[in-house]
C-alpha cells in the first residue's frame, strides 16, 4: 500500500533504503522499526528497512525476523559474531537497493521523523548529513567527540560539525560503490574522507538527539576510544593509496595539510619522549 506524502512535506526523489545497525538492541529495535514504517511512506513511495544484527547475544534477531515476516519491507542481515559498527553499516549499504540510502542508529536516540528536515536537500546533494542540535550524551563522550571532530578536520580536511552523527542520507550509487574498510566507529570518517576525494556535494542539517531509554551504550568506552585512535592512524595511511573512481564527479587530490599535521605531531611526540629519556638517564 502506498501512502501520499503529508501536507507540506516533500517526497524524496526515487526509492529509499533505511539501514539500522543493531547490537543487543532487543528493547529498542521494534519501536524504531515500527516508527520507520509509519514515517517513511510520507517521503518515499518505495522504501525498505534493512536491519543489520551485528552478532547480538539477546533477542534482536528474533524481533526483526518477526517484523520481517509481518511486513516485506523489513529485511534482516545477520553477522554470526560481533564485527563492529563500521562492518554493520558496510553490510547494510551492500544489501541496500534504494536510490537513496539513509542510516540511523537503532537505540532510539534519533527520531526517523527528522528525515523531513533532510528531505528538501536530498535531490541536490550527494550527502545530507545531520548534526545534533543538542547532544544528550555523558560529558566524557561529548568532550571526546569535540576532540575527534577537530582531529578529523586537521588530518582529512573533512569539515563536518558532527562527524559521527548517525543520521545521514547518501546517494545510493555513491555509498554502494565506495570501498569501506573501517570495522568500527571510524566508518563515518572514512566515508566522508573518501567522499571529499570524490568531490561529493554535502549539506549539513540540524537534527534532534534524545537520551537513551533502554539498552547499554558502548561508544564512549575506553576500548572503543583506543580502537578509534588506532583506526584513525590506519585510515590516514590508507588514504595515501586511495584513488577516486573514474565515475567521481570532481576528483580532488590528497589532503597534504593532514600529512603535515601528522608528521608535526609525530615529531613533537618523538621530541617529548627524547626529552623524558634524557632526564631519566641523567
Roles of regions detected by a PLM:
Residues 47-50, 61-95:
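Conserved donor nucleotide-binding strand/loop of the catalytic core
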Residues 27-31, 58-67:
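Acidic helix N-cap motif at the loop->helix transition within catalytic regions
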Residues 1-14, 157, 180-282:
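Hydrophobic helical membrane-anchoring modules
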Amino acid at each position: 500500500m502506498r501512502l501520499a506524502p503529508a501536507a507540506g512535506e516533500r517526497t524524496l526523489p526515487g526509492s529509499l533504503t533505511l539501514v539500522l545497525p543493531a547490537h543487543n538492541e532487543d528493547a529498542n529495535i521494534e519501536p524504531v522499526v515500527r516508527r520507520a514504517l509509519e514515517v517513511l511512506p510520507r517521503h518515499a513511495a518505495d522504501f525498505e528497512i534493512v536491519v543489520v544484527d551485528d552478532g547480538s547475544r539477546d533477542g534482536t534477531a528474533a524481533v526483526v525476523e518477526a517484523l520481517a515476516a509481518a511486513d516485506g519491507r523489513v529485511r534482516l542481515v545477520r553477522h554470526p559474531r560481533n564485527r563492529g559498527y563500521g562492518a554493520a553499516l558496510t553490510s547494510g549499504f551492500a544489501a541496500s537497493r534504494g536510490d537513496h540510502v539513509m542510516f540511523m542508529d537503532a537505540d532510539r536516540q534519533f527520531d526517523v521523523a527528522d528525515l523531513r528536515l533532510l528531505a528538501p536537500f536530498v535531490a541536490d546533494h550527494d550527502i545530507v548529513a545531520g548534526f545534533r542540535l543538542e547532544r544528550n550524551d555523558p560529558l566524557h563522550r561529548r568532550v571526546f567527540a569535540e576532540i575527534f571532530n577537530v582531529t578529523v578536520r586537521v588530518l582529512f580536511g573533512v569539515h563536518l560539525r558532527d562527524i559521527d552523527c548517525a543520521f545521514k542520507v547518501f546517494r545510493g550509487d555513491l555509498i554502494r560503490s565506495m570501498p569501506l574498510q573501517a570495522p568500527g566507529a571510524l566508518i563515518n570518517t572514512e566515508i566522508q574522507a573518501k567522499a571529499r576525494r570524490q568531490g561529493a556535494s554535502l549539506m549539513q542539517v540540524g537534527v534532534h538527539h534524545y537520551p537513551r531509554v533502554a539498552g547499554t551504550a558502548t561508544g564512549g568506552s575506553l576500548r572503543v576510544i583506543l580502537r578509534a585512535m588506532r583506526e584513525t592512524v590506519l585510515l590516514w595511511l590508507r588514504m595515501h593509496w586511495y584513488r577516486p573512481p573514474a565515475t567521481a564527479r570532481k576528483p580532488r587530490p590528497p589532503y597534504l595539510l593532514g600529512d603535515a599535521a601528522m608528521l608535526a605531531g609525530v615529531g613533537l611526540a618523538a621530541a617529548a619522549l627524547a626529552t623524558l629519556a634524557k632526564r631519566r638517564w641523567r
